[in-house]
C-alpha cells in the first residue's frame, strides 16, 4: 500500500479552510425571511442565523399573547429557511474537498 502524501493532504486542508472562510462571509450577506399571521409579523435573518429585522403590524399590538406567538413563529420560519440556505451553500463549497472516508482509506481504515 502506498504511503499517503502528507504535503498534498495539508494543502487540501488549507484550501478547504480558506473556502469555508469565504462561505462564512457569504452567509452573512444572504438573507432569509419568515412571516406569520398572514404577514402581520415578518422576520429576516442572515445565513449565520442572526436576526436582522423584525416587523410587526401595529394593528395587532393590543394582543400581546398573539404578538408573542407570531414573533416566535416568524423567527423560527426565517431561521429554518436560513439553515437550509446555509446548508446548500456549504455543500456547494464543499464539492471536491477532502472526504473523511477517503482519508481513512489512505491510512488503512475502513472508510
Swiss-Prot record:
Keyword annotations for this protein, in alphabetical order, are: Cytoplasm, DNA-binding
Q: Which residues form a coiled coil?
A: none
Quote one Gene Ontology molecular function term.
DNA binding
Q: Where in the cell is it found?
A: Cytoplasm, Nucleoid
Tell me which HAMAP family the record gives. DNA_YbaB_EbfC (MF_00274)
Q: How does it assemble?
A: Homodimer.
Give the protein family.
Belongs to the YbaB/EbfC family.
Q: What is this protein called?
A: Nucleoid-associated protein Cpar_0834
Amino acid at each position: 500500500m502506498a504511503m499517503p502524501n502528507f504535503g498534498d493532504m495539508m494543502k487540501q486542508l488549507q484550501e478547504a479552510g480558506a473556502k469555508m472562510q469565504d462561505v462564512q462571509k457569504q452567509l452573512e450577506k444572504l438573507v432569509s425571511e419568515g412571516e406569520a399571521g398572514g404577514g402581520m409579523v415578518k422576520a429576516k435573518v442572515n445565513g449565520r442565523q442572526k436576526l436582522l429585522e423584525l416587523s410587526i403590524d401595529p394593528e395587532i399590538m393590543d394582543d400581546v399573547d398573539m404578538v408573542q406567538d407570531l414573533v416566535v413563529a416568524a423567527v423560527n420560519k426565517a431561521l429554518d429557511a436560513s439553515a437550509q440556505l446555509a446548508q446548500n451553500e456549504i455543500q456547494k463549497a464543499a464539492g471536491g474537498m477532502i472526504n473523511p472516508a477517503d482519508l481513512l482509506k489512505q491510512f488503512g481504515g475502513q472508510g
